[in-house]
From Swiss-Prot:
Keyword Ribonucleoprotein applies: yes
Keyword Kinase attributed: no
Name of the protein in question: Large ribosomal subunit protein bL35
Superkingdom assignment: Bacteria
InterPro entries: Ribosomal_bL35 (IPR001706), Ribosomal_bL35-like (IPR021137), Ribosomal_bL35_CS (IPR018265), Ribosomal_bL35_sf (IPR037229)
UniProt record similarity statement: Belongs to the bacterial ribosomal protein bL35 family.
């Protein structure tokens, strides 16, 4: 059986923590920022964990992470 391929798009967007959770950056911070408050933009800078409902699918497209 051939090797499984890693989704390169996902590999660039997610990192695995020491405990095996997937860390990601938040969306909505590339443009149209003038109507967002400073507090909102500051909170968007923080990384967050991937939701548990998506972890099963993420493990399939990131087999070696």
């Amino acid at each position: 059986m051939p090797k499984m391929k890693t989704s390169r798009a996902a590999a660039k967007r997610f990192k695995v923590t020491g405990t095996g959770k997937l860390k990601r950056n938040k969306a909505y911070k590339r443009h149209i920022l003038t109507k967002k408050t400073t507090k909102t933009k500051r909170n968007l800078r923080k990384a967050t964990m991937t939701d548990e409902t998506n972890v099963k699918n993420m493990k399939k497209i990131l087999p070696y992470m």
